[in-house]
Amino acid sequence: RTVLEGLMLAYRYILEKVGRGRHGLVKMKTGDWNDQAVYGRVPATKIKYAQKHGESMLNSAMAAYSFRIFGEMLLAAGQAEAGAVSLAAADEMKAAVQAQWNGKWFKRAFLGEKLGWLGDDLLWLEPQPWAIIGGAADENMKKILAANIKALLCDINPNGAALISRNAEKQENSAGLNTGELENGGVWPAINGYLVWALAKID
């Protein structure tokens, strides 16, 4: 296969096999980058439910960026119709991500009606950089988001931005992990790298 054919397979897999949920976001399936988002926080009896109905803000924000780049590549390759479809999908994904702004940050994931949203009352870092990079955050959102990331994620750890905020009233419970450890609020270089990229886009 050519590189373009391989990219098209991946693109179509996301749209046609993984699909989108009721909020227009990429479905969570077995999880996204953070396995603990499902396996660490969903009761064992409801994991199958969350996998079926869940939606990933992280994957959706990345798709908003990736589909736009892919669409531009298709146009440059002379595939006008396919390029237009990819660009339209990017715009739809961007709008779906933007709709989950809660006034302070973007939510993390939808786990189905029975379980609700993850990341509404606590700030999860993972989707935030990609919401900026993918264009879902407008200028006002960017400034609010940057301030909250600094105050709630950067200032609590000298080694970088933590994955999850915490306060006296609420902390996330992740099976088998202490607060501030690994996916349960630890510092991950990969996500901090995307954060640097995103923050560089803010005036």
Where are these regions (language model features)?
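Aromatic-rich carbohydrate-recognition surfaces in CAZymes
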Residues: R1-K27, M57-S60, A64, L182-I202
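Catalytic cores of carbohydrate-active enzymes
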Residues: M62-E172
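A structural signal for alpha-helical segments
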Residues: T2, Q51, L58, A77-A88, ...
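Carbohydrate-binding/catalytic loop surfaces
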Residues: R1, H23-G54, G103-P127, A161-W188
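A generic structural motif
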Residues: K52-S56, I69-F70, A77, I202
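Short, glycine-/Ser/Thr-/acidic-enriched flexible segments
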Residues: W130, A136-E139, G193-L195, K201-D203
